């Protein structure tokens, strides 16, 4: 990440330092008079042993929030495992280092100990899990009675903004990251007196989230209404939503016994399941409209939507979600976790069986670690933005484990810890108050957020201002100054006539739009445990340590806003092309021409590219706050007549890096670094390590960095493979080599043009 400046450059930097009215739009802050806030980083999709993770709640919280020993600690954290049920007690700690007075180490037990062997089968509630049952505890019970109390205790003990969420197993689809925060972390937790002996009685609760899990998770077949087994003692939940007649529809599975829509099976299960999920969103909107969020996770992974199964999401399903609950369903995780896996993001060719036919993850793989829905300029994300929807981009870790390595090893052949590689930076308007679940969720909802991998950048201000002839004129320098002030203080803007991410700038026809971007590519090393030259960049003669990436360029992407699509219209629903109709055998794609009109926005294109040199070079500017160097850039969009949006992406990869980027700088398919098919591996890793860890050694943070290609890299194969027999870029090296950031959009709404209906 190091940038080298001459004395003259530093001196110059020091000088520089001086559509549809029927759609309900979410509530958002106006462009002026905002509550003060800062960009803070977090993660809302990760796992413990209560679902299918490898570690305890306590170990995960420590790994994720510690900024000294770890050291990639996040500013806020949502623990969110799968819905359904599980048999392991994630509240039991691994060792004495994690022991606390309320949750001490229990001899002979740990986070892989079953519920039956820790609390006893008789304490397991609901149907089927307790005495004589499977030993599995329903997630609603573990959230309500075990996981939430631990999270509240740790939040109070460590003074950290923590809360509990869920990776729902989605009816009709695969997974979504979500939470209902009602009841969680009341202000009284700030002054709670913590116990000095085992046990903690929380002041708040996760009852609303637990009820949602019971009512709507596809893997929850319990009909106990959240009660003690075989009794009416307990929650006595009723999932009826008086705001929706379909909430008790027998056609989609209503159970009078369970007072819920039960999971169904057989022909049409996907279609019925989707309708149930829409009801889940309506329930959230009606009962917890400002206290919940619902973000489809790794949504390309399970393939396209399957009306007779539970697979992926097509664009029409995202539209349905946003239409049903725009304050709740406002984005997606199109940059999945599992970044170190042998199939990056766990996206894979022929991953899924749909109707007996092996079917790719949508797009076949990721593209620079991002799913095709967002990575493809003009694709699904641009189609949604082209409607003027509040549909935002997020990234999360999906932490489970390190693959072939233990949880304390810095290497990985599967996952990264939350904050270690990917993080979402969100503007949280908490004023003088501490960070709290409500202000964090409010921040996510606004879309004033951006995501980066590998700490490629750690600050960003993205600003658009209107300029008119005469007294309303604005210079580039004046807008740059606004952005510099925001970026150097890790905050956003509060200026009339200007907007930032997740907002819209309302202008008169003919206005000039002045766009300024100021960001920081942080000096020094990132959190990679390697320090040898980046092998992907070595292909083009760039010698750059893999743990010191340098931002190569920033793309400004623009698209037109043409209004909301109408349900049932020909351009509302459309499936991304399957298998080789999109991703060909050689790893190239068929391009947007093969994508149906419903799933693309052909007006979207790269409008401007900034880099360190050339006609659109950024300018270094030294912060007056901490003396670090920021990069500033600006341009003008003249005489706008049509509503539109602009968004950003950037990478450490120049254009035309073999097997990484095309000639325009777009990310290529990650099949060339996915170790699940070694015949496709194409980038050799040749630096020999002089400190290669011996077999069985745990490589910890204290050991520093490995100075050559690690032994666990896959070996390329294939008679026609030019690097057959060589260690190839794969697993975590593929991820650390290839870094990207994505911003959310700024909308420009031109009077007498299309209304940007999704944003106030």
Tell what function each PLM region has.
Residues 1-31:
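Gram-negative bacterial Sec-dependent N-terminal signal peptides
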Residues 31-760:
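Extended, charged catalytic domains and RNA/DNA-binding interfaces, predominantly
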């Amino acid at each position: 990440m190091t940038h080298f400046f001459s004395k003259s450059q530093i001196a110059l930097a020091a000088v520089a330092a001086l559509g549809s009215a029927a759609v309900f739009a979410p509530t958002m802050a106006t462009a002026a008079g905002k509550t003060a806030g800062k960009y803070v980083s977090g993660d809302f999709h990760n796992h413990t042993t209560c679902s299918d993770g490898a570690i305890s709640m306590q170990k995960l919280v420590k790994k994720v929030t510690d900024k000294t020993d770890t050291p990639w600690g996040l500013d806020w954290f949502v623990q969110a495992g799968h819905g359904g049920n599980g048999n392991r007690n994630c509240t039991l700690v691994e060792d004495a280092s994690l022991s606390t007075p309320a949750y001490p180490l229990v001899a002979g037990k740990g986070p892989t100990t079953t519920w039956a062997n820790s609390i006893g089968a008789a304490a397991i509630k609901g149907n089927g899990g307790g005495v004589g049952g499977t030993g599995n505890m329903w997630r609603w019970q573990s959230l309500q009675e075990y996981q939430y109390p631990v999270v509240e205790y740790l939040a109070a003990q460590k003074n950290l903004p923590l809360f509990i969420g869920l990776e729902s197993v989605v009816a009709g689809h695969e997974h979504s990251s979500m939470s209902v925060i009602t009841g969680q972390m009341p202000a009284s937790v700030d002054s709670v007196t913590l116990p000095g002996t085992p046990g903690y009685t929380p002041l708040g609760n996760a009852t609303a989230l637990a009820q949602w899990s019971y009512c709507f998770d596809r893997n929850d077949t319990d009909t106990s209404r959240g009660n003690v087994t075989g009794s009416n003692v307990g929650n006595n939940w009723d999932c009826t939503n008086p705001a929706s007649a379909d909430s008790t529809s027998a056609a989609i599975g209503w159970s009078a016994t369970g007072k819920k829509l039960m999971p169904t099976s057989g022909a049409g299960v996907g279609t019925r399941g989707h309708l149930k999920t829409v009801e889940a969103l309506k329930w959230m909107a009606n009962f917890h409209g400002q206290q919940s969020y619902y973000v489809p996770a790794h949504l390309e992974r399970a393939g396209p939507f399957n009306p007779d199964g539970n697979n992926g999401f097509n664009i029409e399903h995202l539209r349905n979600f946003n239409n049903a609950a725009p304050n709740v369903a406002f984005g997606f995780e199109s940059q999945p976790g599992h970044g170190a896996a042998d199939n990056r993001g766990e996206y894979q060719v022929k991953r899924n069986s749909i109707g007996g036919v092996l079917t790719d993850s949508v797009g076949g793989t990721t593209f620079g670690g991002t799913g095709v829905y967002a990575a493809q300029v003009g694709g699904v994300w641009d189609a949604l933005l082209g409607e003027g929807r509040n549909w935002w981009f997020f990234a999360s870790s999906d932490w489970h484990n390190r693959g072939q390595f233990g949880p304390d090893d810095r290497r990985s052949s599967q996952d990264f810890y939350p904050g270690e590689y990917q993080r979402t930076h969100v503007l949280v308007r908490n004023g003088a108050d501490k960070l709290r679940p409500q202000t964090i969720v409010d921040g996510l909802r606004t879309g004033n957020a951006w995501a980066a991998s590998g700490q490629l950048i750690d600050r960003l201000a993205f600003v658009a201002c209107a300029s008119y002839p005469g007294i309303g004129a604005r210079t580039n320098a004046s807008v740059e100054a606004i952005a510099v002030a925001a970026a150097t203080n890790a905050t956003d803007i509060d200026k009339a006539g200007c907007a930032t991410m997740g907002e819209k700038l309302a202008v008169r026809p003919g206005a000039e739009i002045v766009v300024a971007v100021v960001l920081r590519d942080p000096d020094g090393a990132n959190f990679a445990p390697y320090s040898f030259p980046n092998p992907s960049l070595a292909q083009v003669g760039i010698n750059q340590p893999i743990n010191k990436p340098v931002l190569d360029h920033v793309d400004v992407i623009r698209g037109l806003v043409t209004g909301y699509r109408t349900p049932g219209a020909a351009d509302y629903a459309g499936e991304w092309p399957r298998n080789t109709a999109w991703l060909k055998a050689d790893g190239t794609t068929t391009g947007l021409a093969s994508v149906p009109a419903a799933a693309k926005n052909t007006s979207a294109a790269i409008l401007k590219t900034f880099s360190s040199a050339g006609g659109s070079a950024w300018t270094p500017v030294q912060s007056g706050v901490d003396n670090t160097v920021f990069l500033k850039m600006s341009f003008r969009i003249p005489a706008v007549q049509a509503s539109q949006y602009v968004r950003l992406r950037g990478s450490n990869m120049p254009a035309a890096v073999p097997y990484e980027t095309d000639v325009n700088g777009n990310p290529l398919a990650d099949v060339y670094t996915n170790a699940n098919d070694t015949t496709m591996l194409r980038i050799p890793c040749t630096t020999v390590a002089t400190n290669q860890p011996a077999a069985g050694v745990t490589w910890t943070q204290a050991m520093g960095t490995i100075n050559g290609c690690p032994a666990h890299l896959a070996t390329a194969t294939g008679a026609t493979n030019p690097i057959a027999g060589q260690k190839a870029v794969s697993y975590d090296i593929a991820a650390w080599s290839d870094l990207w950031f994505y911003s959310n959009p700024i909308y420009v709404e031109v009077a007498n043009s299309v209304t940007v209906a999704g944003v106030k």
